[in-house]
From Swiss-Prot:
Transmembrane segments: 48-68, 86-106, 121-141, 179-199, 203-223, 281-301, 348-368, 383-403, 429-449, 458-478
GO terms of molecular function: transmembrane transporter activity
Pfam families recorded: MFS_1 (PF07690), Sugar_tr (PF00083)
Keyword Membrane: yes
Name of the protein: Putative transporter SVOPL
Gene3D superfamilies, alphabetized: MFS general substrate transporter like domains (1.20.1250.20)
Length: 492
């Protein structure tokens, strides 16, 4: 039987064999995430429009919150209110804010940031206008509480900004949003100095509602967050939004197909207390509570010091005491001391302080990091609260208030950025909402310290503010996660 001749095995024949049997590699299609798209598209005209429109939510929020500080002397006299009654107005505003911060955060993670932002502005504008017709103190408190409920949803504007901004621009653009809060604060103080002495506080509230109404119309130019759409599985809407951003920025989209992460349940409160985020969440809550306590404490203390002339602990002799009733049993003093033009000037100067440290704040959070920057500014805030107790001239008081406003504003800037960056998209709005809610507990307590305790003991009130700031500084320094230069997380 004849056999087929075999070819000798050589290196060349083995190489041919290996080349002949190699299976062709299947080329996988290119894909990209929302994060890739945001970074590729870069910063441009869309982000400028986003910054102006979403930043203006800070103007409206500042006007609604600061309004209480400038109308307090007027309603104190009109309805003959005691200290605790004046403080209760601010407390109830923040009570409404606290309750609805959680609700709006849950709804925003489920149904979208844009929808909740629009609803909150419609709500706030409606009840703000109704406040101007309040027939009594009780109605005034109730309606301002409803305004607080609406204002609590304004933080969704910050989330939308954060989710559209490229990583390297977040640390610069988000602190600049403080300009809008400053503008709102200055605007309401300026309007109050003109409107209250002429046509009254009710017209001040009506005029203050106008910016919010205008902004509602402007919202149609801003789309829903692409990150939110992708996280809910709506990649088509997310892709359309990203293409619109790229076109407006005259940029290009990354090559490939937009992919979505594994879908998770959204807006679960339990996620905030998951082992991965438990310590971060608890420390953030402490910091938010303390920062809000200090911030609104400074604002209300400034108004109280000016209204009652409590510099160096002496009450003004010029306060008019109004007693309710005809009998001697009714001893309910109401200090009718309206703000003079000089008082409005002092408030304006101290308010401008909110932007004084902005350049240093931007450098700090981008070079030192969010944690260290926040711990330094909180420590300085504690120091200046104590310095405020020093007997000094009017110029000295203005200087201390100026620095305090600068520091507390820097604190808010940093904690807003950190909170928006540390949580993933699936729970970011809820994280902001719950933090904002805890924050309002501090704001609810602040009026009773600034407007009630301060009347009895300035040193006691200032030491309390300072101690809380020290606790927050330690908490900020020991936060477990640093978000400087870190990409936004899409899923948990």
């Amino acid at each position: 039987m004849a056999t087929k001749p075999t070819e000798p095995v050589t290196i060349l024949s083995l190489r041919k064999l290996s080349l002949g049997t190699a299976e062709p590699q299947v080329k996988e299609p290119k894909t990209f995430t929302v994060e890739d798209a945001v970074e590729t598209i870069g910063f441009g005209r869309f982000h400028i429009a986003l910054f102006l429109i979403m930043g203006s939510t800070g103007v409206v929020e500042a006007m609604e919150i600061m309004l209480i500080a400038v109308v307090s002397p007027v309603i104190r006299c009109e309805w003959q209110l005691e200290n605790w009654q004046v403080a209760l107005v601010t407390t109830m505003v923040f009570f409404g804010y606290m309750v609805f911060s959680i609700l709006f955060g849950l709804l925003a993670d489920r149904y979208g940031r844009w929808k909740i932002l629009l609803i909150s502005f419609l709500w706030g504008a409606y009840f703000s206008l109704l406040t101007s017709f309040a027939p009594s103190y009780i109605w005034f408190v109730f309606l301002r509480t409803m305004v607080g409920c609406g204002v609590s949803g304004h933080s969704q504007g910050l989330i939308i900004k954060t989710e559209f901004l490229p990583t390297k621009y977040r640390g610069y653009m988000l602190p600049l949003s403080q300009v809008f809060w400053l503008a709102g604060s200055l605007l309401i103080i300026g309007l109050a100095s003109v409107i209250i002495p002429t046509i009254g506080w009710r017209w001040l509230i009506r005029v203050a509602s106008i910016p919010g109404i205008i902004l509602i119309v402007a919202f149609k130019f801003i789309p829903e967050s692409a990150r939110f759409n992708v996280s809910t599985g709506n990649t088509r809407a997310a892709l359309a939004t990203l293409e619109r951003v790229a076109k407006m920025n005259r940029s290009v989209m990354p090559e490939g197909k937009l992919v979505e992460p594994v879908l998770e349940k959204r807006g679960r409160f339990a996620d905030l207390l998951d082992a991965k985020y438990l310590r971060t969440t608890l420390q953030i809550w402490v910091i938010w509570l303390g920062i809000s306590f200090a911030y609104y404490g400074v604002i209300l203390a400034s108004a109280e010091l000016l209204e009652r002339d409590l510099v160096c602990g002496s009450k003004s002799d010029s306060a008019v005491v109004v007693t309710g009733g005809d009998s001697g049993e009714s001893q309910s003093p109401c200090y009718c001391h309206m703000f003079a033009p000089s008082d409005y000037r002092t408030m304006i100067i101290s308010t401008i302080g909110e932007i004084a440290l902005n350049p240093l704040n931007i450098l700090g959070i981008n070079f030192l990091g969010r944690r260290l920057s926040l711990s330094i500014t909180m420590g300085c805030t504690a120091l200046f609260f104590l310095l405020l107790n020093i007997c000094t001239s009017s110029a000295g008081l203005i200087g201390f208030l100026f620095m305090l406003r600068a520091l507390v504003a820097a604190n808010f800037n940093t904690v807003y950025i950190y909170t928006a960056e540390v949580y993933p998209t699936t729970m970011r709005a809820l994280g902001m909402g719950t933090s904002g809610s805890l924050c309002r507990i501090g704001a609810m307590v602040a009026p009773f310290i600034s407007q009630v305790l301060m009347s009895a003991s300035i040193l006691g009130a200032l030491c309390l503010f300072s101690s809380v700031c020290v606790v927050c500084a330690i908490s900020a320094f020991t936060l477990p996660i640093e978000t400087k230069g870190r990409a936004l997380q899409q899923i948990k």
